[in-house]
């Protein structure tokens, strides 16, 4: 099978694509891949590092206001379609999959126009502009949230989940806890604000640190590398309780996620896919700075099923943070109920499900 993949701009579009590629390689070692992204996007460094052949096109997103930039964007799109057709003819894929971001617009559109089987994968509960546009032309739309289904043609939608979920399974949680200094018998909560950290969450954590010192559970706090020195400076003034561990970054996040009892985090699509696959209860603090407020809508999908609590950033204080953690961690029944609810939402074999959809299209 020859697979052309496109997606970029943010890790949320790139990492699911890489997880899918790794799964396909396991199931079909003969498979060949080409990834098309942009020269300036994260994908231009992440994808080649993963050993996957990479080509780039020039593309930009539409501005919401009428402007000359949008004329340039249309011109770039048309040029991107031509460049994509050239790469497609040269690589001769059996199937093309787009995982979101502006770049997959011209790539997947070009493939559909050339009569090649096409899929888009939508990670969020509210679809991005590119995937909504492409849904008119592709054969299938793979989604991760029930809330996303209504935005696409019903006959094309398949619920597959996020391939990243498959990568957190079969991790050693005890090893994960040990690696960061958490003790095995005690309950623990992991608090983090995404790969780069989040200042409002840092502020609430620092404010709460003295009260955390009185708790029976342990707290692992990940600041994000850019915030670490500032947080540690503030912590030094207040004192660092023995049950609170602070790290700038965690390189073995799937292992650590497996080991902890509760997670406090943003509500990015990849994070939620991992948490539900593992059956982890969570307190979700959606980022209000994302397009279409999609993190709050992602969070709502999990909260409504009883697998998480939602704490809006505007309501985030030391008191509300501790309150929500205590209500889950200190109540065994609540913790257990939320674990079961999360597990029921999870799709741990998401990468395999997506590969099955691809196989069916190729064999049509």
UniProtKB/Swiss-Prot annotation:
Q: Which HAMAP family match?
A: MurG
Where is this protein found? Cell membrane
- What name goes with this protein? UDP-N-acetylglucosamine--N-acetylmuramyl-(pentapeptide) pyrophosphoryl-undecaprenol N-acetylglucosamine transferase 1
Q: Which residues bind UDP-N-acetyl-alpha-D-glucosamine?
A: 10-12, 124, 195, 250, 295
Q: What is its main location?
A: membrane
A GO CC annotation given for this chain:
plasma membrane
Q: A GO molecular-function term, please?
A: UDP-N-acetyl-D-glucosamine:N-acetylmuramoyl-L-alanyl-D-glutamyl-meso-2,6-diaminopimelyl-D-alanyl-D-alanine-diphosphoundecaprenol 4-beta-N-acetylglucosaminlytransferase activity
In terms of CDD domains, this protein maps to: GT28_MurG
| Family according to the record | Belongs to the glycosyltransferase 28 family. MurG subfamily.
Task: Quote the InterPro entries the UniProt record gives.
Answer: GlcNAc_MurG, Glyco_trans_28_C, GlycoTrans_28_N
UniProt key word Cytoplasm = no
Name the membrane topology term.
Answer: Peripheral membrane protein
Main function = Cell wall formation. Catalyzes the transfer of a GlcNAc subunit on undecaprenyl-pyrophosphoryl-MurNAc-pentapeptide (lipid intermediate I) to form undecaprenyl-pyrophosphoryl-MurNAc-(pentapeptide)GlcNAc (lipid intermediate II).
Q: Does the keyword Endoplasmic reticulum apply?
A: no
Q: What is its EC number?
A: 2.4.1.227
Cite the annotated pathway: Cell wall biogenesis; peptidoglycan biosynthesis
* Keywords assigned: Cell cycle, Cell division, Cell membrane, Cell shape, Cell wall biogenesis/degradation, Glycosyltransferase, Membrane, Peptidoglycan synthesis, Transferase
Reaction catalysed by this enzyme = di-trans,octa-cis-undecaprenyl diphospho-N-acetyl-alpha-D-muramoyl-L-alanyl-D-glutamyl-meso-2,6-diaminopimeloyl-D-alanyl-D-alanine + UDP-N-acetyl-alpha-D-glucosamine = di-trans,octa-cis-undecaprenyl diphospho-[N-acetyl-alpha-D-glucosaminyl-(1->4)]-N-acetyl-alpha-D-muramoyl-L-alanyl-D-glutamyl-meso-2,6-diaminopimeloyl-D-alanyl-D-alanine + UDP + H(+)
Record-linked Pfam families: Glyco_tran_28_C, Glyco_transf_28
One GO term (biological process):
carbohydrate metabolic process
Organism expressing this protein natively: Bacillus cereus (strain ATCC 14579 / DSM 31 / CCUG 7414 / JCM 2152 / NBRC 15305 / NCIMB 9373 / NCTC 2599 / NRRL B-3711)
């Amino acid at each position: 099978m020859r697979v052309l993949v496109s997606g970029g701009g943010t890790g949320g579009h790139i990492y699911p694509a890489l997880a899918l590629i790794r799964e396909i390689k396991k199931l079909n070692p003969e498979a060949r891949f080409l990834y098309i992204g942009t020269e300036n996007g994260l994908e231009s460094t992440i994808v080649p590092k993963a050993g996957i052949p990479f080509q780039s096109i020039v593309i930009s997103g539409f501005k919401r206001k009428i402007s000359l930039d949008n004329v340039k964007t249309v011109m770039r799109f048309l040029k991107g379609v031509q460049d994509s057709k050239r790469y497609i003819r040269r690589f001769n894929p059996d199937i093309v999959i787009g995982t979101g971001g502006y770049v997959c617009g011209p790539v997947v559109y070009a493939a559909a126009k050339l009569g090649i089987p096409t899929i888009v994968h939508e990670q969020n509960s509210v679809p991005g502009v590119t995937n909504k546009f492409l849904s008119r032309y592709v054969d299938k739309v793979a989604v991760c949230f029930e809330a996303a289904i209504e935005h696409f043609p019903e006959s094309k939608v398949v619920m597959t989940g996020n391939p990243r979920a498959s990568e957190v399974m079969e991790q050693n949680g005890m090893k994960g806890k040990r690696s960061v200094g958490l003790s095995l018998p005690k309950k623990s909560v992991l608090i983090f604000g995404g790969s780069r950290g989040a200042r409002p969450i840092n502020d609430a954590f620092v404010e709460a640190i003295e009260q955390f010192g009185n708790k029976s559970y342990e707290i692992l706090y990940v600041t994000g590398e850019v915030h670490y020195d500032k947080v540690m400076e503030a912590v030094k003034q207040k004192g660092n309780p023995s049950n609170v561990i602070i790290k700038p970054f965690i390189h073995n996040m799937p292992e650590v996620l497996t080991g902890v009892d509760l997670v406090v985090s943003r509500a990015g699509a990849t994070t939620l896919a991992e948490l539900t696959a593992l059956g982890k209860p969570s307190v979700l603090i959606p980022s209000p700075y994302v397009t279409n407020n999609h993190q709050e809508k992602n969070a709502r999908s999990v909260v409504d099923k009883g697998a998480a609590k939602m704490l809006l950033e505007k309501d985030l204080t030391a008191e509300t943070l501790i309150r929500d953690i205590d209500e889950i961690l200190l109540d065994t029944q609540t913790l257990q109920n939320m674990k079961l609810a999360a597990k029921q939402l999870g799709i741990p074999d998401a990468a395999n499900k997506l590969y099955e959809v691809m196989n069916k299209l190729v064999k049509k």
